[in-house]
Swiss-Prot record:
SUPFAM superfamilies: Cupredoxins. Residues 1-98 form the Plastocyanin-like domain. It comes from Ulva prolifera (Green seaweed). GO terms for molecular function: copper ion binding; electron transporter, transferring electrons from cytochrome b6/f complex of photosystem II activity. It is found in: Plastid, Chloroplast thylakoid membrane. This is Plastocyanin. The lineage of its organism: Eukaryota, Viridiplantae, Chlorophyta, Ulvophyceae, OUU clade.
Amino acid sequence: AAIVKLGGDDGSLAFVPNNITVGAGESIEFINNAGFPHNIVFDEDAVPAGVDADAISAEDYLNSKGQTVVRKLTTPGTYGVYCDPHSGAGMKMTITVQ
């Protein structure tokens, strides 16, 4: 499984790493690393055709350190992801599914 931290160890508002490649159906575990409220929103304009961005997003906030969300993406392509409250600060990432 791939692991993505929400918030850097240094307190930065970032997905760490901010670019990953996974196999179709591989688990991606998002972990709140900072204790700030973060969420995982798939950009409806930046997912493969036919993918329901709302269905794979986790819009409810992960409020506490250590909270996790797991997603499995089965459609190959590139996915743009952002944290809604912190996207203005550049908290975005790209997931490539092969």
